[in-house]
Design a protein with these regions (language model features):
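Generic C-terminal helix-cap and adjacent flexible tail
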Residues: 2-3, 127-130
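Conserved hydrophobic "DFG−1" position in protein kinase catalytic cores
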Residues: 12-13, 20, 87, 104
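Conserved Nudix-box catalytic region and its N-terminal flanking loop in Nudix hydrolases
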Residues: 17-56
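Hydrophobic packing within well-folded, soluble alpha/beta domains
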Residues: 50-54, 67, 102
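Active-site-adjacent beta-strand/loop module that shapes the phosphate/pyrophosphate-binding cleft
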Residues: 61-63, 71-93, 103, 107
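NUDIX/MutT-family hydrolases
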Residues: 86, 95-126
Length: 130
């Protein structure tokens, strides 16, 4: 049986734009786009994990809003259960520490990127809300 990996993703809004993060060349799913986030640690809630991951990866703090969706996707390395939330930055803009690049895109343009498969359902939900 494949390993289940619980992860969170932040759909970070700034006015009418959404933060998109491109995975590094040496990460799994190299150069694909994703909503930033990461693995949920033992005894950690989804929201706690989201705040911690964004603080560690992007050196900024989040205001976490409504949950968008939970999706599962089976990769060769395991089954990723991704829980995405609408978020806003508290103050500081994100700093790249792990990702190759970031972009702020209009919601209508989100589908122009090559997204990691687990993120695609959340992308579609956000685009359909506009």
């Amino acid at each position: 049986m494949k390993k289940q990996i619980e992860v969170v993703g932040a759909i970070i809004f700034n006015d009418d734009k959404v933060l998109c993060a491109q995975r590094n060349e040496n990460m799994s799913l190299p150069l694909m786009w994703e909503f930033p986030g990461g693995k949920i640690e033992k005894d950690e809630s989804e929201i706690e994990a989201l705040k911690r991951e964004i603080s560690e990866e992007m050196l900024c703090d989040l205001e976490v809003g409504d949950k968008v969706t939970s999706t599962s996707y089976e990769y060769h390395f395991g089954i990723v259960n991704l829980h995405t939330y609408k978020c806003k930055l508290k103050e500081k803009m994100p700093t790249l520490t792990e990702h190759k690049s970031i972009q702020w895109l209009d919601v209508k343009d989100l589908e122009t990127l090559e997204w990691a498969p687990a993120d695609i359902p959340a992308v579609k939900i956000i685009v359909d809300e506009v």
